[in-house]
């Protein structure tokens, strides 16, 4: 069905003689429905596919390792259409990347996740520079709950296993340290947490500082931002007690 829909869209552009003068971008949603992927800030949960076609501009078959985010799409379309990108818009135009003028785009990528109201508030923030990923679990003393995962049959089978490896995997998913740091080039599945390894203390400090800087710029106060608030009538009752 997906292939057919994409093909139909491209065929319409071709029939209207617009294909050679149109930028087409296809992106996927992030993550698959497996523990350690969707609904997490690990790589498998935040990375997504992106394919672009722009005849005469993008050379067919080319790839880029530039760090880009969804927020870059709007300024890209405005730029391609000849408009001026407002300063208030997040993201940067991808035109230079598409034209092959640069191999880089953003220095860092940022990610946000929370599971409200599926369990205890469990806000997560993360940052990646393309080589290392830092994950900040803001309420590490809580147990992570994700309803979609826990309803899955394979989750129950994992939980029922009495092997050390199965328990290790389940515990890693449900109970997390405050900080996680991974070398995503050497450890693409992010199983070896380097956050407390002295050798990587400078990288941890750098990414933590940059993440906090971005959170401040986004008016993100952290855990308090994600905790669900009581309805106003309950707040009034509590105030009168």
Task: Give the ranges of each region predicted by the language model.
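Active-site His/acidic residue clusters
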Residues: 30-42, 198, 220
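Substrate-binding rim/cap in mid-to-C-terminal beta-strand-loop elements of soluble/periplasmic
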Residues: 7-15, 35-88, 92-105
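A generic secondary-structure signal for well-formed alpha-helical elements
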Residues: 10-13, 17, 22, 55, ...
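A structural signal for well-ordered alpha-helical segments within the folded catalytic domains
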Residues: 3-7, 68-75, 89-92, 176-179, ...
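Structural recognition of the beta-strand scaffold that forms the well-ordered cores
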Residues: 23-27, 50-52, 69, 76, ...
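C-terminal cap/loop subdomain of S1 sulfatases and analogous C-terminal strand-loop tails that border
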Residues: 32-34, 81-180, 215, 235-237
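Long, internal low-complexity/basic segments
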Residues: 47, 161-179, 184-241
């Amino acid at each position: 069905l997906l292939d057919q829909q994409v093909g139909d869209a491209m065929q319409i552009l071709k029939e209207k003689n617009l294909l050679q003068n149109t930028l087409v971008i296809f992106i996927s949603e992030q993550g698959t429905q497996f523990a350690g992927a969707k609904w997490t800030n690990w790589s498998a949960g935040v990375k997504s596919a992106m394919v672009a076609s722009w005849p005469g501009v993008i050379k067919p078959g080319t790839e880029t390792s530039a760090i880009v985010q969804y927020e870059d799409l709007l300024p890209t379309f405005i730029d391609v259409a000849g408009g001026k990108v407002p300063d208030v818009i997040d993201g940067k135009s991808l035109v230079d990347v598409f034209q092959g003028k640069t191999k880089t785009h953003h220095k860092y990528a940022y990610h946000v996740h929370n599971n409200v109201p599926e369990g205890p508030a469990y806000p997560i923030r993360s940052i990646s520079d393309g080589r290392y990923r830092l994950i900040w679990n803001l309420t590490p003393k809580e147990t992570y709950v994700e309803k979609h995962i826990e309803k899955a049959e394979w989750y129950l089978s994992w939980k029922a296993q009495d092997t050390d490896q199965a328990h290790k995997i389940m515990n890693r998913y449900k109970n997390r340290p405050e900080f996680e740091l991974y070398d995503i080039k050497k450890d693409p599945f992010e199983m070896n947490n380097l956050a407390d390894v002295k050798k990587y203390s400078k990288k941890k400090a750098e990414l933590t500082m940059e993440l906090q800087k971005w959170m401040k710029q986004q008016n993100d106060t952290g855990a308090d931002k994600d905790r669900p608030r009581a309805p106003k009538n309950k707040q009034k009752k509590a105030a009168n007690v």
